[in-house]
């Protein structure tokens, strides 16, 4: 997979990054396909020299399927090359760990009834698309019977071993007495 990412340069404690197009399997500072910009985090945000990007080349690579890393996506969003990515803030991370665990324990029992209600609500939704798909499947008559017969044949096979396993489990208990 092709990535648009930062490649670190500079000396100790003085980072300077190149914005590069690279294969995701390569090392962070390893071989890259093309350099499309630079980023100097030591400069103030309002300085023009902080970020330099080749917008046309970046748009080309995005069109080719290159995926920007989260940091590069923010830089590209701030410079108007792509839409600004959603803010990945996690407000629960600011709460001390002990308090989060207490809240998690209290929330878990409340979530259980909701989880049970959700599958029941989804079941009618699943049946409706199948009913709509059936008339469309009747047009090609040869394919529809094969498709309908296969799921029907699989269902009894799955139920039969369960039914056989239960009597087998009860039989050894009776013999032991």
Swiss-Prot record:
GO biological process, one term: translation
InterPro entries cross-referenced by the UniProt entry: Ribosomal_bS16, Ribosomal_bS16_dom_sf
One MF term in the entry's GO annotations: structural constituent of ribosome
Keywords, comma-separated and alphabetical: Ribonucleoprotein, Ribosomal protein
Record region (Disordered): 80-177
GO cellular component, as recorded: cytoplasm; small ribosomal subunit
Domain of life assignment: Bacteria
Biased composition (Low complexity): 107-122
Tagged with keyword Zinc: no
Homology family: Belongs to the bacterial ribosomal protein bS16 family.
UniProt xrefs under HAMAP family: Ribosomal_bS16
Protein name as it appears in the record: Small ribosomal subunit protein bS16
Native organism: Pelagibacter ubique (strain HTCC1062)
Taxonomic classification: Bacteria, Pseudomonadati, Pseudomonadota, Alphaproteobacteria, Candidatus Pelagibacterales
Gene from which this protein is expressed: rpsP
């Amino acid at each position: 997979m092709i990535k648009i990412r930062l490649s670190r340069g500079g000396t100790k404690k003085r980072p300077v990054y190149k914005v590069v197009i690279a294969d995701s399997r390569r090392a962070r500072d390893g071989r890259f396909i093309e350099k499309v910009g630079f980023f100097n985090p030591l400069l103030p945000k309002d300085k023009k020299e902080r970020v330099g990007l080749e917008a046309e080349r970046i748009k080309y690579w995005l069109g080719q399927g290159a995926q920007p890393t989260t940091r590069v996506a923010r830089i590209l969003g701030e410079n108007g090359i792509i839409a600004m990515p959603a803010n990945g803030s996690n407000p629960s991370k600011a709460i001390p760990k002990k308090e989060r665990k207490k809240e998690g324990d209290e929330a878990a029992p409340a979530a259980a009834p909701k989880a049970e209600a959700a599958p029941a609500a989804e079941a009618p939704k699943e049946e409706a698309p199948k009913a709509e798909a059936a008339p469309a499947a009747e047009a090609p008559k040869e394919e529809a019977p094969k498709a309908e017969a296969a799921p029907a044949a699989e269902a009894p096979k799955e139920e039969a071993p369960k039914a056989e396993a239960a009597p087998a489990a009860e039989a050894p208990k009776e013999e032991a007495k």
